[in-house]
């Protein structure tokens, strides 16, 4: 069939027909192991931001993930119908119910008309990555990713991309930005990435904040995984990835991301049943925070010096955030649930009473 189409039809048609057997084989494999498509989704999610900077994607990125999650759910349903593998009860766990509660809150938030108007398109655009995707991911993981072997394979995959991200950040720091990155910086990111304390590097992510937060999560996850892994090669790999994540966190210059390893170790201490590992984590947590807050160790290093500003109540950048919070407090009595999901700069008119709230930096919008 492939030979006949190649000799009698246009190249594009022949290629499409020739790929049908491979596509059917791939679908069959994914029905047997839906986790393969989940890993592909993870890979795309990790690199699509960088791809979009060099080759702008003509459709909304959320549409791509709508398609991927839709295919995954379809394959899972087919597997449930045609096999005896029924693990749906595994999805009934605490995390699923927490996400269901969060989804319900987000759905209710669709009726938030505090600005005088509803914005269903903006709400739906934010609802998917904030609530629907996490719930679907939890559902898929609970049903089909319930073996330690998958966890190790997934951590290896995650570790490889963490190393790639940290390496790209290292390249930016030591070799400089390429022409596309410089064009983006001068057009959009210079104000937030060229600051008085130095340059904030962003690897192949959308910005330094996302890069730093991702590296902080990787640092915490792989450090804890290294503590528990019994395979010495995996233990070494996890530890190297953790250090790479910590390096990425440093060069990103995102102080808010430091909260991720602090919170991660704190939660681990609460959940840990191994007192030796728990004590080690406690000493690292207290020692790290104490070093940054009460000492001048590493003050000559620009990266450590910037991290230390997180705990400096007189830091100018932190004071700006406090000023934003003071301005927002005037609105909070009127809008305790905010102005609506997705109501950001460009959505509401500058003449709207709540325009300031829509343009206020997101990391300053949570006011006690």
Regions found by a protein language model. Give the residues of each.
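N-terminal signal-anchor transmembrane segment
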Residues: 1-81, 108-112
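Short aromatic-rich membrane-water interface segments that cap or initiate transmembrane helices
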Residues: 122-128, 193-208, 313, 320
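Membrane-interfacial loop-to-transmembrane alpha-helix junctions, especially the N-terminal start
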Residues: 30-42, 87-100, 151-158, 234-238
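Structural signal for the C-terminal ends of transmembrane alpha-helices
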Residues: 24-34, 74-87, 139-150, 223-230, ...
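Long extracytoplasmic/lumenal interhelical loops at the membrane interface
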Residues: 195, 298, 308-368
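A membrane-periplasm/extracellular boundary helix in multi-pass inner-membrane enzymes
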Residues: 167, 173-176, 252, 269-312, ...
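Aromatic-anchored transmembrane helix interface
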Residues: 63-72, 94-104, 118-143, 157, ...
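Alpha-helical transmembrane segments of multi-pass inner-membrane proteins
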Residues: 22-27, 103, 107-111, 135-137, ...
